[in-house]
Amino acid sequence: MGRQPCCDKVGLKKGPWTAEEDRKLINFILTNGQCCWRAVPKLSGLLRCGKSCRLRWTNYLRPDLKRGLLSDYEEKMVIDLHSQLGNRWSKIASHLPGRTDNEIKNHWNTHIKKKLRKMGIDPLTHKPLSIVEKEDEEPLKKLQNNTVPFQETMERPLENNIKNISRLEESLGDDQFMEINLEYGVEDVPLIETESLDLICSNSTMSSSTSTSSHSSNDSSFLKDLQFPEFEWSDYGNSNNDNNNGVDNIIENNMMSLWEISDFSSLDLLLNDESSSTFGLF
């Protein structure tokens, strides 16, 4: 929910305080003491916010406030407390009477930081700057060392793929490798691992050996099928006239058979034509 506002802030005065306002606030607190800061403006007759009255009193109007810069002892105290508490200025101011948290913070930012850096001390960690710089450089070195193996891991698969493709081309031959390129394209050739490549190479050698054996067996069977019948050429010199007569007889018989077939077929055609013409007349 958050803290409720101290007042409505309607018709209240803003800006720097006047001497009369400071006098009213000092007289009220010295006579009545510190009470609820929300009620102080109404009781003292000030047109200010309760928070503004509190800050004006604690930072400027308190009688126990110390004016001026911090002493060497106070600076050492602030450095020791800052190394333990960090930027908790209100807690640091509680250990330094007469000093406000705002005053200590301003003095830290304007004076103490510069002194520590000149002494070679980091104002945030209170360690020597050389050690802090080394600690800052170590993560960068780790990042650089991690990026080099990452680049190597990205380059190794590319080299392996190129080697695998060259081995595949040697094992399959130019024709089959061109068929793969036409089907998939150069960029779409599937990546093949080394184990599968060894299997492909062994299968290709086995298939080549089986294909050569099958070709040889097919050739032998084909030659067996093409074996021609043996002819007896006995008494070739003595029976030339008989062979010539036999050949002449075969030719004459074939010519007669062809003539008889063609003759009968032509007669059938003539008979069919005559029958069709006679039926057409009647």
Curated annotation (Swiss-Prot):
It comes from Arabidopsis thaliana. Its main location: nucleus. Transcription factor that acts as a positive regulator of abscisic acid (ABA) signaling in response to salt stress. Acts as a negative regulator ABI1, ABI2 and PP2CA, which are protein phosphatases 2C acting as negative regulator of ABA signaling. Binds to the DNA specific sequence and core element 5'-ACGT-3' found in the promoters of ABI1 and PP2CA to negatively regulate their expression during ABA-dependent salt stress response. One of its GO terms (cellular component) is nucleus. The keyword Transcription applies. It is found in: Nucleus. This is Transcription factor MYB20. Keywords: DNA-binding, Nucleus, Repeat, Stress response, Transcription, Transcription regulation. Pfam families: Myb_DNA-binding (PF00249). Residues 37-61, 89-112 bind DNA. Residues 9-61, 62-116 form the HTH myb-type domain. The gene is MYB20. One of its GO terms (biological process) is L-phenylalanine biosynthetic process. Disulfide bonds: none annotated. Plants overexpressing MYB20 display increased tolerance to salt stress. Gene3D superfamilies: Homeodomain-like. GO terms for molecular function: cis-regulatory region sequence-specific DNA binding; DNA-binding transcription factor activity; transcription cis-regulatory region binding. Induction: Induced by salt stress, drought stress and abscisic acid (ABA). Down-regulated by salicylic acid (SA) methyl jasmonate (JA). PROSITE patterns: HTH_MYB. Expressed in chalaza of mature seeds, cotyledons, rosette leaves, cauline leaves, veins of stems, mature siliques, sepals and styles. Expressed at low levels in roots.
